[in-house]
Curated annotation (Swiss-Prot):
Species for this entry: Gloeobacter violaceus (strain ATCC 29082 / PCC 7421)
Coiled-coil region list: none
Residues reported to bind Mg(2+): D44, D83, E115
Residues where 3-methyl-2-oxobutanoate binds: D44, S45, D83, K113
Main location: cytoplasm
Catalytic activity of the protein: 3-methyl-2-oxobutanoate + (6R)-5,10-methylene-5,6,7,8-tetrahydrofolate + H2O = 2-dehydropantoate + (6S)-5,6,7,8-tetrahydrofolate
Gene3D superfamilies in UniProt: Phosphoenolpyruvate-binding domains
Encoding gene, per UniProt annotation: panB
Family: Belongs to the PanB family.
Protein name: 3-methyl-2-oxobutanoate hydroxymethyltransferase
Gene Ontology CC: cytoplasm
NCBIfam families: panB, PRK00311.1
Record bears the keyword Cell inner membrane: no
């Protein structure tokens, strides 16, 4: 039986870390699901790793839906969550609801992820959760606001900024978010937030004190040319693929094929 949003709460209660990764297509989603990943996110990071853009901003709702449908076919166990892309939910709770329902109805995801905190986003999260749509919050470095933040920088470094993030986390929990992603914030702050919340936190570049961890799978596997500084790849598939293609190319050019 597949995991639900309540399963993640139980993992936190048992002090069992949540394992989360991103997925963009069927084959990889199936591998990750069978490997026991708890949460799979079809993230707007696919704008960069799958579509070749330089930020998450250009990806559209229809593009993300296409990838979500492919990933859905490969997932049996993991909780499947989709990012709502930039420009598809910020205007109003009603706009967010209209977009989110497409992901649940057309792509079969179980929840959506929104970036940002109060006041506007807590109102939106409350509207969605009261309407039956589970929401994963996202605080700290929020890539959709990269221009406003002045780049991909650590957030919450000052006492005032840290206090604001704590308040936002509590507000999102109060609005009904089932979990929070904490990205690129000081490790001790991530631990403090995790301790104050009943809902689980999932960190990315936020240290070991969150209730789980998430990475972009392309970064984890060494497929990204320039991964974020906080990523320690667990494989070098870029080099492995290059070597395999090189061997194949050499065989074809020398013998026509390897079938003999």
């Amino acid at each position: 039986m597949g995991l639900s949003i309540h399963s993640l709460r139980k993992l936190k209660e048992r002090a069992q870390p949540i394992v989360a990764l991103t997925a963009t297509e069927y084959a990889m989603a199936r591998i990750l699901d069978q490997a026991g990943v708890d949460l799979l996110l079809v993230g707007d990071s696919l704008s960069m790793v799958a579509l070749g853009h330089t930020s998450t901003l250009p990806v559209t709702v229809d593009e993300l839906l296409h990838h979500c449908r492919a990933v859905r076919r490969g997932v049996e166990r993991a909780l499947l969550v989709a990012d709502l892309p930039f420009g598809s939910y910020e205007q109003s709770p009603q706009q967010a609801f209209s977009t989110a329902t497409r992901f649940l109805k057309e792509a079969g995801v179980q929840a959506v992820k929104l970036e940002g905190g109060y006041p506007r986003m807590t109102e939106t999260v409350a509207f969605l959760t009261e309407s039956g749509i589970p929401v994963l919050g996202h605080l700290g470095l929020t890539p959709q606001a990269v221009h406003q933040l002045g780049g991909y920088r650590v957030q919450g470094k000052t006492a005032q900024a840290a206090e604001r993030l704590i308040d936002q986390a509590l507000a999102l929990e109060g609005a009904g978010a089932f979990a929070l992603v904490l990205e690129h914030i000081p490790y001790d702050l991530a631990g403090e937030i995790s301790g104050k919340l009943v809902i689980p936190t999932v960190g990315i570049g936020a240290g070991p004190h969150c209730n789980g961890q998430i990475l972009v799978t392309h970064d984890l596997l060494g497929l990204t040319e320039n991964p974020p500084p906080f990523v320690n790849p667990y494989a070098d598939l870029r080099a492995l693929i290059s070597k395999a293609v090189g061997r194949y190319s050499a065989d074809v050019r020398a013998h026509g094929s390897r079938e003999e």
